Amino acid sequence: MSSTTAIRLAARPSSWRGTGALSSGRPLSQFASLPRRSINPSISGMRQGTLRLSIHDGRLFFSTQPPKDTPENMNNKETGSSNVIFMPPPPPAQTEAPSSGSAKEDTTDATNKSETETPTAASESETSKSSESDVSSASTSDSANSSETTTTTSETTPENGNNDTAQPELPSRTEAHRARLSARFSTIMDNFQTRLLTATQTLNDLTGYSAIEQIKRKNAELEVAHGQAQSRLRDARHNYKSLTMHRASTQREVTTLLARKDTWNPLDLERFTSLYRLDHELEAQVAQAAQELTEAETEESRLSADLNAGILKRYHEEQIWSDRIRRQSTWGTWGLMGVNVLLFLVLQFVAEPWRRKRLMKGIAENEKGVIDEVRHELGQVRQALEASGLRETAHLARLMEQEREIQALASTSSSSGDPQGGGGRTEGEVEMDIGAEFMAAAAEEAAEEAATAQQQQQQQQQQQQQQHHQTPETQEEPQQPPLTWKQTAQKWQQTLSDPQQIKAAVVDLYSDRRIDLKMRDVSLLALESAATGAAVVASVAFFVLRSSGSGKA
């Protein structure tokens, strides 16, 4: 095999036009490990003799332009033989999913076949003709294989879908669902925190505390700057003191040398010269240190004044803000008290009568059966009384008939008469006998009626006692109808106009008279007393604080 190998790669579909030709010094054995997917050999750096193969889905192209033919390449083309490699089409896709090992075997088989089926041409013209014919045949076979692959894939897709749906819920899906819920919860919490911070900032803006926050931040910056200025001032003061002490020691040494000027030697002269020069340098350094110290003191004083002013301003603004909040809280407290009073009035004059009326209606419905029974018994008693009255009337009618008969007998006996005048009874005696009989019959009837009435009364008392023991909660005393406003006003007017009634009412307030109250009424009285006491205490405290505040002002 020659050093130059020309590879003609034919594109599979008809839409992929052109062939790729590359010249390289690499042998063909390096192309044996290419996968059976569509291979796109992209050649970059042809001039450097390097070869790079890149895998693309269904397209073969060169990333760079092919190099121009050099005289050496032209000589190689004329003298050497060129080998043309045609990439075979991939086999049709199988329904079963191939494993990684089988994929490697198919790849090596396809590569070996491509090497064995590689024809050799004697000339460049025959190579081009055979490549064109193979391009057309390869395109047709590739289109057929692609259609078969598409059909097979479409047939296997429903089976895979059915297998997916038949599988139970996997832990991965549960974990993904939990991850989505966790992400959603995190998003909700982040939004909540953002809204909370926004609401806090809005509240600060409305109440005017944002300006105080700015003053606090500015004071913090001034405090940091003031600390730095103090450190610079300490350094400048220490530098000034050290330079001053050094110059003083130098001046003392110079004075000592001048005192024994007559006994100087060359070393003393040299020392004096150096000390004099050092004194001049120290003088300049001391002047500069004094200037730096003055600037540091000025800066520290300015920052200290600014910091004190900022602290005073913050205190003043916070005092005003606290007074405003206190004033608003006072109005809010009064508003809450007003709402409580309004609720109390609504409960007492609207809700409580409605509830009482509803309760009475419920009690009336519950006692309707008992009242019907009582009415039935009263009707029976009335019928019994009416029946006894009819019996008494019939008895009186019977007695009147007997009296008429007796009168008739008496008249007949008086008309016939006893000739002796003493053998028969007189009319007065007969009337007395009749009256005695009538009185005896009337007494017997009255005794019977009294006994019957007493028995009925005892039965009614027993029934009432039984009802009282059975339903003590549902029985209530009959309530009098509520008085109107006019009647109440008249009653109060009469009570106030009469001193005796006023005295009796006052004495009755602390008397030992027993009254019956419900627990609900006692609770309402306690709540009313507590509300009244709280209102009185709050009013007194408000007026005291207001008077103290006005006194301080």
From Swiss-Prot:
It holds the Pfam family She9_MDM33. InterPro entries: MDM33_fungi (IPR008839). Residues 133-160, 443-473, 484-495 have a biased composition (Low complexity). Residues 62-84 have a biased composition (Polar residues). It is a multi-pass membrane protein. Keywords: Coiled coil, Membrane, Mitochondrion, Mitochondrion inner membrane, Transit peptide, Transmembrane, Transmembrane helix. GO terms for cellular component: mitochondrial inner membrane. Homooligomer. Required for the maintenance of the structure of the mitochondrial inner membrane. Involved in mitochondrial morphology. Causes growth arrest when highly overexpressed. This is Sensitive to high expression protein 9 homolog, mitochondrial. It comes from Neurospora crassa (strain ATCC 24698 / 74-OR23-1A / CBS 708.71 / DSM 1257 / FGSC 987).
